[in-house]
């Protein structure tokens, strides 16, 4: 591992130098007493922008060893950091923000507001104001674009990339990220509504990015997503293989290489080759540190959902939950990832029509959520922060209770929906899209109760941005439309779900159902 860290340091510094010469753009000021730490931090930022973020954990360790008071560096999280350590770093940076440049100070404030106070709206305003004062720094606009993403505003996000490209038409990070507004990436990346996506434009952005950095595997990797968006799985496979060739031989731990194997697994999944997909998914896991595995581990298990083999899914998720709980990782990491596995176990019980199993799983989840809250109690979180975290945990549990009650036909759905609504309303000051969940489950409940018009009314309240890629609720929306006589629109949605080539839990649960509806 030490050798890998040294190689990462050497290779990344060389790439950083080449990038700066190519871009010749103004970089934000950084405050440190170490020239070497400054050089490495510039490298970290370039890596994050240019699909080399895997190199950053050892660099960030070295930066804080060289200068323990490099406060801006403390805003960067890392696989090597425990959650409590990162919170401590960020609190320390916030307390000392007056000791750095104004630009660093405001980015520290914004990061603190989003991560510690869970207030993305305020973080977004801080960065917007900073751009007004310092419009020449593209890196501030990249921070802003990330916040617009978290606020689920693809238009404002796209505008930030357009502004960067107006200043520098050859900005790799802006071209690379702007393309991703036009196709699915993962659940954390917001996209344009389907009707406004332009895969040809996305392709042009990626090809230009590739011409700027021809050895960067990122553009080819995401061209694979473009082809999947066109349902051209053979071309997607070729693009992913091209990206793999650009990467060369993988390191022992190599999440970029792992991600390419994951993409190739997706190609096999949507070709109906589930055994081959599971082989590729399992191979991709071999290139990950254990802390990285739980999220990716879901994908091979989701293939059982397509086969309606929920018992096998429960066995697999239970196995990973045990491995997580028996690992040597920190307690909070174990709790968060046990929640992830247990939620999948719960969903498997739901769709296996096992109410007793779902109830038992829900009790487990409630216990894990209590442990999660307790971990914040001991980390120095303020009362306001604890109340927000508790409310979010209550929302998660209430959503699952409601989901269960809808599927098993409980009589108290209105009461359960009102409870969810009350919890979500508390978040409106921090999340303008907070009520989306309420309308989705209200639509679902109305459909199950035979009130198709109410279902359509609630689902229509949800923006296309948040509805289009939600295959699960789109399926029930399509059913409501069909039952109300709008067969044309229903068929369009069903066809989109049936032909989907992007792997999510919701898609895995309903795709085969949608195919049978056509």
Residue ranges and their predicted role:
Residues 33-62, 66, 105-119, 125, ...:
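Alpha-helical segment of the N-proximal tetratricopeptide repeat
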Residues 41, 72-78, 105-109, 139-143, ...:
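Alpha-solenoid helical repeat scaffolds
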Residues 50-51, 77, 84, 116-117, ...:
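Structural motif corresponding to the intra-repeat A-B loop/turn of tetratricopeptide repeats
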Residues 53-54, 87, 119-120, 154, ...:
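TPR-repeat structural position
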Residues 56, 86, 123, 157, ...:
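Single-residue signature of alpha-solenoid repeat helices
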Residues 61-66, 94-100, 128-135, 164-169, ...:
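Solenoid-like repeat scaffolds
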Residues 111-113, 145, 180-184, 406-409, ...:
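Alpha-helical adaptor scaffolds
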């Amino acid at each position: 591992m030490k050798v890998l860290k040294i190689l990462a340091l050497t290779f990344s510094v060389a790439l950083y130098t080449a990038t700066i010469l190519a871009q010749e753009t103004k970089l934000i000021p950084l405050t440190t007493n170490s020239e070497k730490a400054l050089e490495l931090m510039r490298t970290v930022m370039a890596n994050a922008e240019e699909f080399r973020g895997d190199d950053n954990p050892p660099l960030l360790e070295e930066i804080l060893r060289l200068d323990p008071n490099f406060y801006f560096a403390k805003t960067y999280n890392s696989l090597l950091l425990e959650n409590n350590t990162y919170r401590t770093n960020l609190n320390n940076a916030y307390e000392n923000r007056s000791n750095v440049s104004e630009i660093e100070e405001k980015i520290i404030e914004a990061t603190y507001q989003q991560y510690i106070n869970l207030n993305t709206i305020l973080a977004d305003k801080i960065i917007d104001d900073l751009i007004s004062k310092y419009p020449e720094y593209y890196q501030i606009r990249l921070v802003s674009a990330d916040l617009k993403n978290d606020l689920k505003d693809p238009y404002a996000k796209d505008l930030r990339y357009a502004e960067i490209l107006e200043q520098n038409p050859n900005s790799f990070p802006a071209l690379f990220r702007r393309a991703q507004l036009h196709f699915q990436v993962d659940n954390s990346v917001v996209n344009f509504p389907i009707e406004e996506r332009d895969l040809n434009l996305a392709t042009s952005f990626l090809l230009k990015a590739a011409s700027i950095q021809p050895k960067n595997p990122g553009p080819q990797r995401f061209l694979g997503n473009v082809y999947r968006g066109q349902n051209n799985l053979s071309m997607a496979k070729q693009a992913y293989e091209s990206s793999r060739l650009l990467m060369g031989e993988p390191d022992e731990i190599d999440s970029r290489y792992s991600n390419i194997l994951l993409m190739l697994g997706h190609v096999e999944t949507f070709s109906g080759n589930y055994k081959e997909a599971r082989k590729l998914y399992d191979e991709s896991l071999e290139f990950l540190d254990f802390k990285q595995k739980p999220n990716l581990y879901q994908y091979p298990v989701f293939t059982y959902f397509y086969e309606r083999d929920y018992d096998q899914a429960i066995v697999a998720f239970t196995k990973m939950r045990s491995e997580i709980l028996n690992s040597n990782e920190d307690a909070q990491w174990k709790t968060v990832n046990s929640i992830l596995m247990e939620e999948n176990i719960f969903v498997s019980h739901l769709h296996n029509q096992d109410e007793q199993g779902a109830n038992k799983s829900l009790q487990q989840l409630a216990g894990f959520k209590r442990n999660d809250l307790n971990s914040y109690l001991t980390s120095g979180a303020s009362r306001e922060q604890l109340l927000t975290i508790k409310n979010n945990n209550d929302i998660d549990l209430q959503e699952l209770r409601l989901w269960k009650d809808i599927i098993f036909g409980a009589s108290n759905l209105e009461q359960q929906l009102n409870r969810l609504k009350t919890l979500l309303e508390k978040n409106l000051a921090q999340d303008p899209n907070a009520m989306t969940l309420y309308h989705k489950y209200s639509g679902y409940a109305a459909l199950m109760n035979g009130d198709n018009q109410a279902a359509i009314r609630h689902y229509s309240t949800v923006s296309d941005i948040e509805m289009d890629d939600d295959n699960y609720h789109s399926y029930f929306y399509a059913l409501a439309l069909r039952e109300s006589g709008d067969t044309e629109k229903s068929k369009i949605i069903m066809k989109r779900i049936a032909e989907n080539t992007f792997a999510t839990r919701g898609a895995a649960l309903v795709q085969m159902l949608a195919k049978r509806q056509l």
